Regions:
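Post-transcriptional modification and biogenesis factors for structured RNAs
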Residues: 1-178
Length: 178
């Protein structure tokens, strides 16, 4: 099974974030990075590594959000994460920084002209799975920075799966390939 880090970049829905936490926990993801405007649970309530949350900057450790906003978002994420937010090592990064993953293969989950079908993809031993915004996906300028682009074939009339559903499908395929 490959070593996997997941990045959820610019995901709007707290319910999607919670479901992504729960899915990451189920597939043994090493770390979840929430970046951009993706909502994130209360950082001050998380245990320190190696048991749970990673915090890259001390200023982030003391959660900068207003208490009522922080508590509301944490409750909303918990509704679908059901405690997985306390089990999956995570951190919040305001900006997407793919350069920090030396030694990892960066794989975007997106529909693009150069994407490879998830069914045909052979995952490397260490990878970062990049997820993008629910409606617009991952911008072209970001896709130009990744090593591979994979997509889930669609057989119905809709263009794409919900991001949390797609995460589950992709993680299943990546962890059971080979």
């Amino acid at each position: 099974m490959p070593e996997i880090i997941v990045i959820a970049h610019n995901i709007r829905s707290t319910h999607n974030v919670g479901a992504i936490f729960r899915t990451c926990e189920g597939f043994g993801v090493q770390r979840l990075i929430l970046s951009g405007y993706t909502p994130y649970p209360d950082l001050s309530l998380q245990p320190t590594p190696p048991h749970c949350a990673y915090h890259l900057e001390e200023t982030v450790r003391a959660d900068p959000r207003l208490p009522h906003i922080r508590e509301k978002i944490t409750r909303q994420i918990h509704k679908t994460a059901l405690g997985a937010e306390a089990l999956v090592p995570f951190d919040y990064q305001p900006e997407l920084d793919l350069e920090q993953f030396a030694g990892y293969h960066i794989v975007a989950l997106e529909q693009a002209p150069t994407s490879v079908s998830l069914q045909q993809y052979q995952p490397p031993s260490k990878l970062v799975l990049l997820l993008g915004e629910e409606v617009h996906g991952i911008p072209a300028e970001t896709l130009s920075l990744v090593d591979d682009i994979i997509e889930i074939p669609m057989y119905g009339q809709k263009e794409a799966f919900n991001v949390s559903v797609a995460t589950g499908i992709a993680l299943y395929a990546l962890t059971t390939a080979g």
